[in-house]
Amino acid sequence: MAKKSMIVKALRKPKYKTRQKNRCKLCGRPKGYMRDFGMCRICFRNHASAGLIPGVSKSSW
């Protein structure tokens, strides 16, 4: 879990666009961010396996 201060800091609009850092909307993790879903890979995996993300299923071949 990210510190609350870091999450609040990331939510503020930066002075320059290049300073913006994408963070997971659920846990605040800055790395492993998936832009299409707005969450990190760990939260994505948990939600996908629980069936909370429509249209996403575990692949097998």
UniProtKB/Swiss-Prot annotation:
PROSITE patterns: RIBOSOMAL_S14. One of its GO terms (molecular function) is structural constituent of ribosome. Its cofactor is Zn(2+). Binds 1 zinc ion per subunit. Keywords: Metal-binding, Ribonucleoprotein, Ribosomal protein, RNA-binding, rRNA-binding, Zinc. Zn(2+) binds at residues 24, 27, 40, 43. Signal peptide: none annotated. It comes from the Bacteria. GO terms for cellular component: cytoplasm; small ribosomal subunit. One of its GO terms (biological process) is translation. NCBIfam families: PRK08061.1. PANTHER family: 30S RIBOSOMAL PROTEIN S14, SMALL RIBOSOMAL SUBUNIT PROTEIN US14M. Binds 16S rRNA, required for the assembly of 30S particles and may also be responsible for determining the conformation of the 16S rRNA at the A site. Part of the 30S ribosomal subunit. Contacts proteins S3 and S10. Belongs to the universal ribosomal protein uS14 family. Zinc-binding uS14 subfamily. This is Small ribosomal subunit protein uS14. It comes from Borrelia turicatae (strain 91E135).
